[in-house]
Amino acid sequence: MKLQINAGPLKGNVTVPGDKSISHRALIFGSIAEGKTEIKGLLKSQDVQRTLVALRHLGVTIEESDQKVIIQGKGFSGLTAPDSPLDMGNSGTSLRLLAGLLSGQDFPVQFFGDASLSQRPMDRIVIPLREMGARVEGQGPKHLPPITVLGSSQLTAINYQMPLASAQVKSAILLAALQTKGQTQVFEKAVTRNHTEVMIKQFGGEIFQSGKEIRIIGPQTLKGQSLTIPGDISSAAFWIVAALIIPGSAISIKNVGINPTRTGIIDLVKKMGGAIELTDRDDINQSATIHVSYSKLKGTRIAGEMIPRLIDELPIIALLATQAEGTTVVQDAQELRVKETDRIQVVTSLLRKMGADIEEKTDGFVIKGKTELHSCQADAFLDHRIGMMVAIAALLVKTGEMILNGEEAIQTSYPQFFKDLESLQHD
Protein backbone atom coordinates (compact mmCIF):
# COMPACT_ATOMS: atom_id res chain seq x y z
CA MET A 1 0.00 0.00 0.00
CA LYS A 2 1.08 3.60 -0.54
CA LEU A 3 1.22 5.24 2.85
CA GLN A 4 -0.89 8.36 2.54
CA ILE A 5 0.61 9.86 5.66
CA ASN A 6 1.11 13.59 5.83
CA ALA A 7 4.01 15.09 7.72
CA GLY A 8 2.91 17.15 10.67
CA PRO A 9 2.42 16.96 14.42
CA LEU A 10 0.38 14.34 16.26
CA LYS A 11 -1.98 15.70 18.90
CA GLY A 12 -4.72 14.38 21.16
CA ASN A 13 -5.55 11.23 23.10
CA VAL A 14 -5.31 7.59 22.11
CA THR A 15 -6.12 4.28 23.80
CA VAL A 16 -4.06 1.35 22.57
CA PRO A 17 -5.43 -2.22 22.42
CA GLY A 18 -5.11 -4.64 25.32
CA ASP A 19 -1.70 -6.06 26.17
CA LYS A 20 -0.87 -8.97 23.89
CA SER A 21 1.24 -10.90 26.41
CA ILE A 22 -1.40 -10.61 29.13
CA SER A 23 -4.24 -11.45 26.71
CA HIS A 24 -2.68 -14.80 25.72
CA ARG A 25 -2.10 -15.70 29.35
CA ALA A 26 -5.55 -14.59 30.53
CA LEU A 27 -7.18 -16.94 28.01
CA ILE A 28 -4.95 -19.84 29.02
CA PHE A 29 -5.34 -19.34 32.77
CA GLY A 30 -9.09 -18.84 32.46
CA SER A 31 -9.26 -22.17 30.63
CA ILE A 32 -7.24 -24.19 33.15
CA ALA A 33 -8.86 -22.60 36.21
CA GLU A 34 -12.00 -24.08 37.72
CA GLY A 35 -15.13 -21.99 37.29
CA LYS A 36 -15.94 -18.87 35.32
CA THR A 37 -13.39 -16.25 34.25
CA GLU A 38 -14.46 -12.87 32.88
CA ILE A 39 -11.94 -10.80 30.88
CA LYS A 40 -12.35 -7.16 29.90
CA GLY A 41 -9.94 -5.41 27.55
CA LEU A 42 -8.76 -8.56 25.73
CA LEU A 43 -6.74 -7.78 22.61
CA LYS A 44 -8.79 -8.70 19.54
CA SER A 45 -5.99 -9.54 17.11
CA GLN A 46 -4.82 -12.40 14.91
CA ASP A 47 -2.22 -13.67 17.41
CA VAL A 48 -4.56 -13.75 20.39
CA GLN A 49 -7.30 -15.30 18.27
CA ARG A 50 -4.94 -18.24 17.57
CA THR A 51 -4.74 -18.95 21.31
CA LEU A 52 -8.51 -18.56 21.74
CA VAL A 53 -9.37 -20.91 18.88
CA ALA A 54 -6.80 -23.48 20.04
CA LEU A 55 -8.33 -23.53 23.54
CA ARG A 56 -11.77 -24.12 22.02
CA HIS A 57 -10.30 -27.09 20.14
CA LEU A 58 -9.11 -28.36 23.53
CA GLY A 59 -12.71 -28.43 24.75
CA VAL A 60 -12.96 -25.04 26.48
CA THR A 61 -16.15 -22.96 26.15
CA ILE A 62 -15.29 -19.31 25.41
CA GLU A 63 -17.96 -16.70 24.73
CA GLU A 64 -16.99 -13.39 23.08
CA SER A 65 -18.82 -10.06 23.07
CA ASP A 66 -17.73 -6.49 22.33
CA GLN A 67 -17.18 -5.73 26.01
CA LYS A 68 -15.84 -8.94 27.51
CA VAL A 69 -14.87 -12.58 27.11
CA ILE A 70 -16.31 -15.26 29.39
CA ILE A 71 -14.50 -18.58 29.84
CA GLN A 72 -15.99 -21.65 31.49
CA GLY A 73 -12.82 -23.08 33.01
CA LYS A 74 -12.20 -26.81 32.72
CA GLY A 75 -9.38 -27.24 35.22
CA PHE A 76 -6.25 -29.09 34.14
CA SER A 77 -8.11 -32.42 34.07
CA GLY A 78 -10.89 -31.16 31.80
CA LEU A 79 -8.89 -30.47 28.64
CA THR A 80 -9.53 -32.86 25.75
CA ALA A 81 -7.50 -33.89 22.71
CA PRO A 82 -8.09 -31.73 19.62
CA ASP A 83 -9.41 -33.49 16.52
CA SER A 84 -6.80 -31.88 14.23
CA PRO A 85 -3.42 -30.09 14.40
CA LEU A 86 -3.51 -26.62 16.01
CA ASP A 87 -2.78 -23.69 13.67
CA MET A 88 -0.66 -21.08 15.46
CA GLY A 89 -0.42 -18.74 12.47
CA ASN A 90 2.32 -16.21 13.24
CA SER A 91 2.10 -16.54 17.02
CA GLY A 92 5.21 -17.85 18.74
CA THR A 93 3.66 -16.99 22.11
CA SER A 94 0.66 -19.24 21.43
CA LEU A 95 2.84 -22.16 20.38
CA ARG A 96 5.37 -21.98 23.21
CA LEU A 97 2.86 -21.44 26.02
CA LEU A 98 0.40 -24.06 24.79
CA ALA A 99 3.22 -26.57 24.27
CA GLY A 100 4.18 -26.07 27.91
CA LEU A 101 0.59 -26.46 29.05
CA LEU A 102 -0.05 -29.59 26.99
CA SER A 103 3.18 -31.24 28.14
CA GLY A 104 1.21 -32.15 31.26
CA GLN A 105 -1.66 -33.79 29.37
CA ASP A 106 -1.93 -37.45 28.32
CA PHE A 107 -2.71 -36.88 24.65
CA PRO A 108 -0.72 -35.95 21.53
CA VAL A 109 -0.99 -32.53 19.87
CA GLN A 110 0.64 -31.15 16.75
CA PHE A 111 1.27 -27.41 16.29
CA PHE A 112 2.01 -25.72 12.97
CA GLY A 113 2.25 -22.12 11.76
CA ASP A 114 2.87 -19.78 8.86
CA ALA A 115 6.12 -19.33 6.92
CA SER A 116 7.53 -16.94 9.52
CA LEU A 117 6.71 -19.09 12.55
CA SER A 118 8.07 -22.17 10.76
CA GLN A 119 11.54 -20.57 10.87
CA ARG A 120 11.51 -19.81 14.60
CA PRO A 121 13.55 -22.12 16.87
CA MET A 122 11.61 -24.18 19.41
CA ASP A 123 14.61 -26.05 20.86
CA ARG A 124 14.50 -23.56 23.72
CA ILE A 125 11.23 -25.12 24.97
CA VAL A 126 11.90 -28.65 23.71
CA ILE A 127 14.93 -29.11 25.99
CA PRO A 128 13.32 -28.27 29.38
CA LEU A 129 9.99 -29.94 28.54
CA ARG A 130 11.81 -33.15 27.56
CA GLU A 131 13.75 -32.93 30.82
CA MET A 132 10.39 -32.91 32.64
CA GLY A 133 9.32 -36.08 30.81
CA ALA A 134 7.27 -34.86 27.85
CA ARG A 135 8.02 -36.09 24.33
CA VAL A 136 8.43 -33.02 22.13
CA GLU A 137 9.66 -33.15 18.53
CA GLY A 138 10.28 -30.46 15.93
CA GLN A 139 12.05 -30.26 12.58
CA GLY A 140 15.86 -30.38 12.48
CA PRO A 141 18.38 -29.51 15.20
CA LYS A 142 16.58 -26.27 16.14
CA HIS A 143 13.20 -28.08 16.34
CA LEU A 144 11.41 -25.74 13.96
CA PRO A 145 7.61 -26.07 13.64
CA PRO A 146 5.62 -28.20 13.01
CA ILE A 147 6.01 -29.39 16.62
CA THR A 148 4.50 -32.54 18.10
CA VAL A 149 3.89 -32.76 21.86
CA LEU A 150 3.05 -36.04 23.59
CA GLY A 151 2.61 -35.02 27.19
CA SER A 152 2.35 -36.93 30.43
CA SER A 153 0.35 -36.49 33.61
CA GLN A 154 3.41 -37.83 35.44
CA LEU A 155 5.95 -35.10 34.67
CA THR A 156 9.04 -34.72 36.86
CA ALA A 157 9.94 -31.48 38.66
CA ILE A 158 13.24 -29.96 37.50
CA ASN A 159 15.79 -27.30 38.37
CA TYR A 160 16.40 -25.38 35.16
CA GLN A 161 19.07 -22.81 34.41
CA MET A 162 17.77 -20.63 31.58
CA PRO A 163 20.41 -20.32 28.81
CA LEU A 164 18.76 -17.13 27.50
CA ALA A 165 16.37 -14.45 28.74
CA SER A 166 12.92 -15.51 27.51
CA ALA A 167 9.56 -14.98 29.19
CA GLN A 168 7.97 -17.45 26.77
CA VAL A 169 10.32 -20.28 27.71
CA LYS A 170 9.93 -19.50 31.41
CA SER A 171 6.14 -19.50 31.01
CA ALA A 172 6.14 -22.84 29.16
CA ILE A 173 8.04 -24.43 32.06
CA LEU A 174 5.76 -22.85 34.68
CA LEU A 175 2.60 -24.03 32.90
CA ALA A 176 4.00 -27.56 32.90
CA ALA A 177 5.16 -27.21 36.53
CA LEU A 178 1.65 -26.29 37.70
CA GLN A 179 0.67 -29.87 36.75
CA THR A 180 3.81 -31.53 38.15
CA LYS A 181 4.27 -33.08 41.58
CA GLY A 182 7.13 -31.51 43.52
CA GLN A 183 9.15 -28.29 43.35
CA THR A 184 10.32 -26.89 40.02
CA GLN A 185 12.94 -24.15 40.08
CA VAL A 186 13.78 -21.79 37.22
CA PHE A 187 16.89 -19.62 37.30
CA GLU A 188 16.65 -16.71 34.85
CA LYS A 189 19.63 -15.33 32.95
CA ALA A 190 18.06 -11.87 33.29
CA VAL A 191 14.71 -10.84 34.76
CA THR A 192 12.03 -11.01 32.03
CA ARG A 193 8.38 -9.94 31.92
CA ASN A 194 6.55 -11.61 34.79
CA HIS A 195 2.95 -11.73 33.57
CA THR A 196 2.75 -15.51 34.09
CA GLU A 197 3.94 -15.27 37.69
CA VAL A 198 1.49 -12.42 38.40
CA MET A 199 -1.37 -14.38 36.85
CA ILE A 200 -0.63 -17.55 38.82
CA LYS A 201 -1.15 -15.50 41.99
CA GLN A 202 -4.24 -13.76 40.57
CA PHE A 203 -5.85 -17.15 39.94
CA GLY A 204 -5.14 -18.33 43.49
CA GLY A 205 -1.92 -20.23 42.85
CA GLU A 206 1.37 -20.05 44.72
CA ILE A 207 4.72 -19.10 43.27
CA PHE A 208 7.86 -17.84 44.98
CA GLN A 209 10.36 -15.44 43.45
CA SER A 210 13.63 -14.05 44.72
CA GLY A 211 15.61 -12.06 42.18
CA LYS A 212 16.23 -14.34 39.21
CA GLU A 213 15.11 -17.50 41.03
CA ILE A 214 11.53 -18.76 40.69
CA ARG A 215 10.09 -21.71 42.64
CA ILE A 216 6.74 -23.40 42.12
CA ILE A 217 5.33 -26.47 43.87
CA GLY A 218 2.73 -28.55 42.07
CA PRO A 219 0.25 -29.76 41.30
CA GLN A 220 -1.98 -26.75 41.91
CA THR A 221 -5.66 -25.93 41.43
CA LEU A 222 -6.60 -22.49 40.09
CA LYS A 223 -9.89 -20.61 40.49
CA GLY A 224 -11.65 -18.47 37.86
CA GLN A 225 -11.31 -14.68 38.19
CA SER A 226 -12.44 -11.34 36.75
CA LEU A 227 -9.63 -9.49 34.96
CA THR A 228 -9.22 -6.14 33.22
CA ILE A 229 -6.31 -6.03 30.78
CA PRO A 230 -4.45 -2.70 30.38
CA GLY A 231 -3.24 -1.30 27.06
CA ASP A 232 -0.09 -2.77 25.54
CA ILE A 233 3.02 -0.67 26.18
CA SER A 234 4.64 -2.30 23.14
CA SER A 235 1.86 -0.79 20.99
CA ALA A 236 2.01 2.51 22.90
CA ALA A 237 5.74 2.65 22.06
CA PHE A 238 4.96 3.62 18.46
CA TRP A 239 3.02 6.70 19.58
CA ILE A 240 5.63 7.53 22.23
CA VAL A 241 8.35 7.59 19.58
CA ALA A 242 6.20 9.42 17.01
CA ALA A 243 5.44 12.22 19.48
CA LEU A 244 9.10 12.53 20.49
CA ILE A 245 10.48 12.88 16.95
CA ILE A 246 7.81 14.93 15.13
CA PRO A 247 8.00 18.66 15.93
CA GLY A 248 4.92 20.12 17.58
CA SER A 249 3.55 16.77 18.75
CA ALA A 250 1.95 16.24 22.17
CA ILE A 251 -0.19 13.18 22.92
CA SER A 252 -1.64 11.27 25.86
CA ILE A 253 -1.93 7.48 25.77
CA LYS A 254 -4.53 6.22 28.22
CA ASN A 255 -4.64 3.06 30.34
CA VAL A 256 -1.21 1.70 29.38
CA GLY A 257 0.26 -1.24 31.29
CA ILE A 258 3.28 -0.20 33.36
CA ASN A 259 4.44 -3.50 34.82
CA PRO A 260 8.08 -2.71 35.81
CA THR A 261 9.40 -5.63 33.73
CA ARG A 262 7.99 -3.88 30.62
CA THR A 263 8.74 -0.18 31.16
CA GLY A 264 12.27 -0.07 29.79
CA ILE A 265 11.16 2.31 27.04
CA ILE A 266 9.95 4.88 29.59
CA ASP A 267 13.30 4.77 31.42
CA LEU A 268 15.13 4.99 28.08
CA VAL A 269 13.18 8.04 26.90
CA LYS A 270 13.99 9.85 30.16
CA LYS A 271 17.67 8.91 29.77
CA MET A 272 17.69 10.35 26.23
CA GLY A 273 16.15 13.62 27.42
CA GLY A 274 12.59 13.05 26.26
CA ALA A 275 9.55 14.77 27.77
CA ILE A 276 7.48 11.91 29.19
CA GLU A 277 5.20 11.85 32.24
CA LEU A 278 2.85 9.32 33.87
CA THR A 279 -0.47 10.22 35.51
CA ASP A 280 -3.65 8.41 36.59
CA ARG A 281 -1.69 5.51 38.04
CA ASP A 282 -3.70 2.41 38.91
CA ASP A 283 -1.55 0.20 41.12
CA ILE A 284 -4.00 -2.72 41.09
CA ASN A 285 -4.08 -3.06 37.29
CA GLN A 286 -0.53 -1.67 36.90
CA SER A 287 -1.61 0.99 34.40
CA ALA A 288 -1.26 4.74 33.81
CA THR A 289 -1.76 7.50 31.27
CA ILE A 290 1.46 8.38 29.43
CA HIS A 291 1.95 11.98 28.27
CA VAL A 292 4.71 12.59 25.72
CA SER A 293 5.75 15.49 23.52
CA TYR A 294 8.38 16.46 20.95
CA SER A 295 11.88 16.61 22.43
CA LYS A 296 15.48 17.09 21.46
CA LEU A 297 17.10 13.76 22.20
CA LYS A 298 20.64 12.53 22.77
CA GLY A 299 22.11 9.15 21.88
CA THR A 300 22.77 6.52 24.52
CA ARG A 301 23.80 2.90 25.14
CA ILE A 302 21.17 0.17 25.57
CA ALA A 303 22.48 -3.17 26.86
CA GLY A 304 22.48 -5.79 29.60
CA GLU A 305 19.47 -6.20 31.85
CA MET A 306 17.67 -3.30 30.16
CA ILE A 307 17.23 -5.39 26.98
CA PRO A 308 14.51 -7.81 28.22
CA ARG A 309 12.51 -4.79 29.49
CA LEU A 310 12.24 -3.34 25.95
CA ILE A 311 13.09 -6.19 23.59
CA ASP A 312 9.90 -5.82 21.53
CA GLU A 313 10.29 -2.06 21.30
CA LEU A 314 13.79 -2.13 19.77
CA PRO A 315 12.68 -1.72 16.12
CA ILE A 316 10.88 1.55 16.88
CA ILE A 317 13.67 2.57 19.29
CA ALA A 318 16.09 2.22 16.35
CA LEU A 319 13.98 4.77 14.46
CA LEU A 320 14.01 7.00 17.55
CA ALA A 321 17.82 6.81 17.61
CA THR A 322 18.06 8.14 14.03
CA GLN A 323 16.51 11.38 15.32
CA ALA A 324 18.72 11.72 18.41
CA GLU A 325 21.94 13.74 18.43
CA GLY A 326 25.00 11.54 18.75
CA THR A 327 25.53 7.79 18.77
CA THR A 328 23.15 5.15 20.10
CA VAL A 329 24.52 1.65 20.67
CA VAL A 330 22.26 -1.40 21.13
CA GLN A 331 24.03 -4.52 22.47
CA ASP A 332 23.05 -7.92 23.94
CA ALA A 333 19.92 -8.04 21.75
CA GLN A 334 20.74 -11.13 19.65
CA GLU A 335 17.26 -12.45 20.53
CA LEU A 336 15.99 -10.01 17.87
CA ARG A 337 17.37 -12.36 15.21
CA VAL A 338 14.78 -15.06 16.02
CA LYS A 339 11.64 -12.93 16.27
CA GLU A 340 9.00 -12.83 13.50
CA THR A 341 11.91 -11.95 11.26
CA ASP A 342 15.60 -11.21 11.83
CA ARG A 343 14.86 -7.78 13.26
CA ILE A 344 18.51 -6.72 13.46
CA GLN A 345 19.07 -7.35 9.76
CA VAL A 346 15.68 -6.01 8.62
CA VAL A 347 15.75 -2.84 10.74
CA THR A 348 19.30 -2.08 9.58
CA SER A 349 18.40 -2.63 5.93
CA LEU A 350 15.19 -0.57 6.01
CA LEU A 351 16.56 2.39 7.95
CA ARG A 352 19.69 2.49 5.78
CA LYS A 353 17.40 2.51 2.72
CA MET A 354 15.73 5.60 4.20
CA GLY A 355 19.07 7.33 4.67
CA ALA A 356 19.92 6.50 8.27
CA ASP A 357 23.49 6.03 9.46
CA ILE A 358 23.15 2.57 10.99
CA GLU A 359 25.61 -0.31 11.32
CA GLU A 360 24.52 -3.89 11.92
CA LYS A 361 26.21 -5.79 14.75
CA THR A 362 25.85 -9.44 15.77
CA ASP A 363 23.78 -8.50 18.81
CA GLY A 364 22.33 -5.11 17.86
CA PHE A 365 23.22 -1.94 15.99
CA VAL A 366 25.13 1.34 16.12
CA ILE A 367 23.12 4.37 14.99
CA LYS A 368 24.47 7.88 14.45
CA GLY A 369 22.04 10.80 14.42
CA LYS A 370 20.44 13.04 13.73
CA THR A 371 19.65 12.17 10.08
CA GLU A 372 16.93 13.23 7.67
CA LEU A 373 15.00 10.27 6.30
CA HIS A 374 13.65 9.94 2.77
CA SER A 375 10.95 7.83 1.12
CA CYS A 376 11.47 4.29 -0.12
CA GLN A 377 9.64 1.07 -0.85
CA ALA A 378 9.58 -1.17 2.22
CA ASP A 379 8.28 -4.59 3.20
CA ALA A 380 6.88 -5.61 6.58
CA PHE A 381 8.36 -9.13 6.21
CA LEU A 382 5.33 -10.68 7.99
CA ASP A 383 6.36 -8.71 11.10
CA HIS A 384 3.83 -6.39 12.73
CA ARG A 385 6.45 -4.30 14.53
CA ILE A 386 8.41 -3.72 11.33
CA GLY A 387 5.23 -2.61 9.55
CA MET A 388 4.39 -0.08 12.26
CA MET A 389 7.98 1.19 12.38
CA VAL A 390 7.82 1.97 8.65
CA ALA A 391 4.49 3.76 9.09
CA ILE A 392 5.92 6.00 11.84
CA ALA A 393 9.04 6.65 9.74
CA ALA A 394 6.75 7.85 6.93
CA LEU A 395 5.68 10.72 9.21
CA LEU A 396 9.23 12.11 8.96
CA VAL A 397 9.48 11.95 5.17
CA LYS A 398 9.04 15.37 3.57
CA THR A 399 9.12 14.38 -0.12
CA GLY A 400 8.10 11.35 -2.16
CA GLU A 401 5.83 8.46 -1.26
CA MET A 402 6.53 5.69 1.22
CA ILE A 403 5.24 2.33 0.00
CA LEU A 404 4.69 -0.45 2.53
CA ASN A 405 4.10 -3.99 1.31
CA GLY A 406 2.59 -6.54 3.68
CA GLU A 407 0.86 -4.03 5.95
CA GLU A 408 -1.65 -6.74 6.93
CA ALA A 409 1.01 -8.04 9.37
CA ILE A 410 0.01 -5.16 11.67
CA GLN A 411 -3.24 -7.06 12.36
CA THR A 412 -1.15 -9.36 14.55
CA SER A 413 -1.18 -6.91 17.47
CA TYR A 414 -2.83 -3.60 16.52
CA PRO A 415 -5.78 -3.91 14.11
CA GLN A 416 -6.87 -0.25 14.45
CA PHE A 417 -3.34 1.20 14.08
CA PHE A 418 -4.01 3.27 10.94
CA LYS A 419 -7.36 4.47 12.29
CA ASP A 420 -5.66 5.72 15.46
CA LEU A 421 -2.91 7.37 13.42
CA GLU A 422 -5.48 9.25 11.38
CA SER A 423 -7.23 10.36 14.57
CA LEU A 424 -4.00 11.75 16.05
CA GLN A 425 -3.26 13.63 12.82
CA HIS A 426 -6.67 15.29 12.74
CA ASP A 427 -7.42 15.79 16.41
Curated annotation (Swiss-Prot):
Protein's recorded name: 3-phosphoshikimate 1-carboxyvinyltransferase
UniProt enzyme class: transferase
PROSITE patterns for this protein: EPSP_SYNTHASE_1, EPSP_SYNTHASE_2
Major location category of this protein: cytoplasm
Source organism superkingdom: Bacteria
EC number: 2.5.1.19
Active-site annotation: 312
HAMAP family cross-referenced by the UniProt entry: EPSP_synth
